[in-house]
């Protein structure tokens, strides 16, 4: 991180997610400087112009411009949103081969600038590409973060809030594991106002359990539904990225479900995967190890094994 002065965020990739993220940063007044970098220079120029025209309405002054990888040298945070998009019918893991080569070029270019900050990865499959960013950058793993299951957890809390007619900010529940088809809900640790969700429904019988299972399925499959309807997801993840950015730049020590490196916790090693972690200006201060029940532990192991299988194929030497 820079000593003194304002903070700088470099956004690599100004497609739907990158431009929505920059918009969220400006609207919330999170960053002092935002530099937009894209292979399509005109797109980055256009986004910078468009965002600058709204500065008069922003809560805080923000310096926004289009730039190149040299601008990453003084960045506190580089957020990678570039890569091939998920198409209808594709899983996130289908994008691996398309995006690893792209990431090698991006990360090597960022590091060549003299960058000494943190990486935040948004591109799918995010757990795999966060691992790739760590490998290609040579940075300590706590300084490389993926968006993980932050959006899945937000979707989960939103739908549970609707079901129980409670503000989603008062629903405490996590989705962990792969940001994708093998993710899992941690029902054993889910509560509203300190009351376990399982206890809230125990008098309602099998129907309530089935309704909660449908809520999880809708969380897991939300991206497929949105992509089928509008071609891409970007607003929700942009706000999730802004939340992680705020935790970093404001040194919040906030607990967020990000893609973090495991080195023994949850019984797993050498994998980036979605888990609750404490986030501050140094990156991941620590990973929170939830107490999972037996079924959740087996499910999590399956999710980690799925990611490790992809990593083994992608990084075989």
Curated annotation (Swiss-Prot):
One of its GO terms (biological process) is glycolytic process. Pathway: Fermentation; pyruvate fermentation to lactate; (S)-lactate from pyruvate: step 1/1. It comes from Geobacillus thermodenitrificans (strain NG80-2). It holds the Pfam family Ldh_1_C. The lineage of its organism: Bacteria, Bacillati, Bacillota, Bacilli, Bacillales. Belongs to the LDH/MDH superfamily. LDH family. Homotetramer. The gene is ldh. Keywords: Allosteric enzyme, Cytoplasm, NAD, Oxidoreductase, Phosphoprotein. The keyword Oxidoreductase applies. This is L-lactate dehydrogenase.
